[in-house]
């Protein structure tokens, strides 16, 4: 999956979970996402997005938020 598709998917999932996307960057092939969770805390998650399916990304985000 390309970076732009993964980022768009992550933004959509965060929006459904009432979270706010802040920024993203790539380091060594890993997509690092910063966002505000439902309680207003800043969170950071890392995704090896090239090797993940849409379902895997969604599960990682849900586990990270809750």
Language model regions located:
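Negatively charged, low-complexity tracts enriched in Asp/Glu with abundant Ser/Thr
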Residues: 1-20, 53, 58, 62-66
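Acidic, low-complexity, intrinsically disordered interaction modules
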Residues: 17-60
